[in-house]
Amino acid sequence: MAIRKYKPTTPGRRASSVSEFSEITRSTPEKSLLRPLSKTGGRNVHGHITTRHKGGGHKRRYRVIDFRRNDKDGVVAKVAHIEYDPNRTANIALLHYRDGEKRYIIAPRGLKQGALVESGPNADIKVGNNLPLRNIPAGTTIHCVELKPGGGAKMARSAGASIQLLGKEGKYAVLRMPSSEIRRVDIRCRATVGEVGNQEQINIRWGKAGRMRWKGWRPTVRGAAMNPVDHPHGGGEGRTSGGRHPVSPWGQLEGRTRRPNRPSDKMIVRRRRPNKKR
């Protein structure tokens, strides 16, 4: 994927860039794999804001992605198209299986239109093929990795993401995550060979607030710029330090967003930042 920079014809375009979409081969999605997608504006069923900075944005339709690929073992599929997906940073690939079925998958880096892919324990180790971890050699770069056998891909699904299979220990595979965390996963879990494509997406400069609003992102306002009724840091005559440690609008200390004592924590061999206090 290439990035095209705009000429500074306006203040909004001066610092902005856009993807050239050179890998995209079709602009119209497969109608049978579309589902309606309603907007929540970050609210729950009671109308209370549960996720800040969300709302508005262009209307979208959800593309149904096959994250399991376990019911098509041994059936060869041809990559019909590489398409854009507004619901994720990665591109998606439309597969035409030999039995006539069509499905979307996350498009790996280097997967081209017309390529053949396959899933199952006997599939070759090549980009786009989906296999159980026990059948993938150590040192292989993988993505779309399951956490539980048959649960569907949960890890390394965004643009440019990849996981390295370090080795196998009994009934577990040892993985190096994109965050440098090392964790164990059941060796029966599936993964797709290669890394997720569209890796240049991180280099796009949005240039103006309006482009973020098109994506459904609302402004992030500092607590110190609010009134006391809206935030613990709000109010004061002029600019003040707040006199306390940074907190959320509900008074919770900033940082430490990972929930401690998760059942899956016992599978972590080395944390992302081993020297940081938990």
Curated annotation (Swiss-Prot):
PROSITE patterns in alphabetical order: RIBOSOMAL_L2
Stretches with biased composition (Basic residues): 45-59, 269-278
Species: Corynebacterium urealyticum (strain ATCC 43042 / DSM 7109)
SMART domains per the UniProt record, alphabetical: Ribosomal_L2, Ribosomal_L2_C
Function of the protein: One of the primary rRNA binding proteins. Required for association of the 30S and 50S subunits to form the 70S ribosome, for tRNA binding and peptide bond formation. It has been suggested to have peptidyltransferase activity; this is somewhat controversial. Makes several contacts with the 16S rRNA in the 70S ribosome.
GO molecular function, a single term: structural constituent of ribosome
Membership in a protein family: Belongs to the universal ribosomal protein uL2 family.
Pfam families: Ribosomal_L2 (PF00181), Ribosomal_L2_C (PF03947)
Quaternary structure and interacting proteins, as annotated: Part of the 50S ribosomal subunit. Forms a bridge to the 30S subunit in the 70S ribosome.
Protein name: Large ribosomal subunit protein uL2
Gene this protein is translated from: rplB
